[in-house]
Amino acid sequence: MKLTESNRSPRTTNTTDLSGKVAVVTGAAAGLGRAEALGLARLGATVVVNDVASALDASDVVDEIGAAAADAGAKAVAVAGDISQRATADELLASAVGLGGLDIVVNNAGITRDRMLFNMSDEEWDAVIAVHLRGHFLLTRNAAAYWRDKAKDAEGGSVFGRLVNTSSEAGLVGPVGQANYAAAKAGITALTLSAARALGRYGVCANVICPRARTAMTADVFGAAPDVEAGQIDPLSPQHVVSLVQFLASPAAAEVNGQVFIVYGPQVTLVSPPHMERRFSADGTSWDPTELTATLRDYFAGRDPEQSFSATDLMRQ
């Protein structure tokens, strides 16, 4: 159904103005997080930028926000710390509240420790799960508790809250050599869907982005940026992702909750949930093991052996 003025929800607006809003962006010293922080600031948001201390020390993101977004009244505050530590998540929330309140969270921080599964160490597994999944959880939980408490005193029990969590197509596909990364990203998607269902009643919108972006973390995957003609943009430029994040963080996204988006160049793909391929029903009240074995064996004997739950078709589009 096409939205018109007569059927548009009262919560729906076209505005992406973030003046007066406070956002937290993790992994914001460089790459995608830096671009997202700048993008939100250009819309008027005050941004709490987070990264590890060494990355922030080498970053110009705070100065860049000050220079690029001064006309919008935005500013940036840096909070150094490991996002996998609860103390960092607590400090990020406290900083946002000190600036007027937490409105937007963009969880972006991440690392890779690629290795074939049979060679992967405990440390390589734990490090990736800690930064990606635990890091997302800690700040998401803090934001959820803050918004829920705030909603108790709000008119109509609703507040403005936007949660944008960064997953990956790896979590839908399961790439060889990235068992840790894929597991963490799949977990982030599930975490966000749970948050969306829990927080939607309070007016909070929680969504997932799966970006294809050329950053330092993905350099080994995507390589160096190509030469582009004047006026053109690299298909893997983080700026493509920023446009979607600006929307999802804004009042205009009030009706968007619990969704998964893939961003690649000028294309934004909305991903549908898994569908049922086939249901196998017993003739009686339960399956006889021999009959179930024969039924499943015969079905898979005529099926493409390369077809699995892995969403490989998404990678080809």
From Swiss-Prot:
It catalyses: (22S)-hydroxy-3-oxo-chol-4-ene-24-oyl-CoA + NAD(+) = 3,22-dioxochol-4-en-24-oyl-CoA + NADH + H(+). Keywords: Cholesterol metabolism, Lipid metabolism, NAD, Oxidoreductase, Steroid metabolism, Sterol metabolism. The active site is at 168, 181, 185. This is Hydroxyacyl-CoA dehydrogenase ChsB1. One of its GO terms (biological process) is cholesterol catabolic process. Disruption phenotype: Cells lacking this gene are shown to be highly attenuated in a mouse tuberculosis model. Required for growth on cholesterol. Homodimer, with 1 active site on each face. Pathway: Steroid metabolism; cholesterol degradation. GO terms for molecular function: 3-hydroxyacyl-CoA dehydrogenase activity; enoyl-CoA hydratase activity. Pfam families: adh_short. It is an enzyme of class 1 (oxidoreductase). Its EC number is 1.1.1.-. NAD(+) binds at residues 32, 51, 82-83, 108, 168, 181, 185, 215. Belongs to the short-chain dehydrogenases/reductases (SDR) family. PANTHER family: DEHYDROGENASES, SHORT CHAIN (PTHR45024), SCP2 DOMAIN-CONTAINING PROTEIN (PTHR45024:SF2). The keyword Lyase does not apply. A reversible dehydrogenase involved in cholesterol side-chain degradation. Catalyzes the oxidation of hydroxyl-cholesterol-CoA ester metabolic intermediate (22S)-HOCO-CoA (3-oxo-chol-4-ene-(22S)-hydroxy-24-oyl-CoA), the product of ChsH3, has no activity on (22R)-HOCO-CoA (the product of EchA19). Also acts on (3R)-hydroxyoctanoyl-CoA and 17-beta-hydroxyandrost-4-en-3-one, but not on 7-alpha-hydroxyandrost-4-en-3-one, uses NAD(+) but not NADP(+). InterPro entries: NAD(P)-bd_dom_sf, Peroxisomal_Beta-Oxidation, Sc_DH/Rdtase_CS, SDR_fam. The keyword NAD applies. The protein surface forms a large groove around the active sites which is larger than homologs, probably to accommodate bulky sterol substrates. Disulfide bonds: none annotated.
